[in-house]
UniProtKB/Swiss-Prot annotation:
GO molecular function, one term: phytochrome binding
UniProt-recorded name of the protein: Phytochrome-interacting ankyrin-repeat protein 1
Subunit structure: Interacts with phytochrome A (PHYA), both in Pr and Pfr forms.
Residues in ANK repeats: 30-59, 67-96, 102-131
PANTHER family named among the record's database cross-references: ANKYRIN REPEAT DOMAIN-CONTAINING PROTEIN 39-RELATED, BRCA1-ASSOCIATED RING DOMAIN PROTEIN 1
Length: 175
């Protein structure tokens, strides 16, 4: 359970706040916690404070339009690389899928918003990028961001480089 927070509450005006009976965490009308809000805003300092106070890095939004979104989805959607890095460092699930109609990963969210650097960051940090990754509508991230083809090409090059350098022996650094 979160302790008292020095981070100022910034729920949207005219939105109702509710306290989850299960977790005791304040949420806005979108079902977002303070960590969701600060991750979406790209407020690195506030995100760090909230995580230091015990906020759940993989908290799921419970609103009707954002069901299952994690703070990482929202940071990716906003293209906030430093916040994404901190969330991943603290254990955020890069493959978390929304539970609404789409079933998006943070990679889908970044691609949809055309946040190329966020896409590059996620792929560079191991985001799952198989040929068949799709949302529940069977759309791959490339469907939302046609500039994403480069990520598939980079993955292919990396795969080829790894297999060429390894040959039939185990991969190890040369002495």
């Amino acid at each position: 359970m979160l302790q008292e927070q020095p981070v100022a509450l910034s729920f949207r005006p005219n939105s109702f706040r509710r306290r989850s009976m299960e977790t005791g965490v304040d949420r806005d009308d979108r079902g977002w916690t303070q960590l969701h809000i600060k991750a979406r805003e790209g407020d690195l300092k506030a995100v760090k404070e909230l995580l230091d106070q015990g906020a759940d890095v993989n908290a799921l939004a419970c609103g009707p339009k954002s069901k299952g979104m994690t703070p990482l989805h929202l940071a990716a959607k906003g293209g906030h690389i430093e916040v994404m890095d901190l969330l991943l460092e603290r254990g955020a699930n890069m493959e978390a899928r929304t539970s609404g109609a789409c079933g998006w990963t943070p990679l889908h969210a970044a691609a949809k918003e055309r946040k190329r650097e966020a896409v590059k960051f996620l792929v560079g940090n191991g985001a799952f990028l198989p040929d068949d990754i799709t949302d529940s509508r069977f759309n791959p991230p490339v469907q939302y961001c046609h500039g994403l083809e480069w990520a598939y090409e980079e993955r292919k090059k990396l795969s080829e480089d790894t297999s060429l350098s390894c040959g039939d022996t185990s991969c190890s650094s040369a002495n």
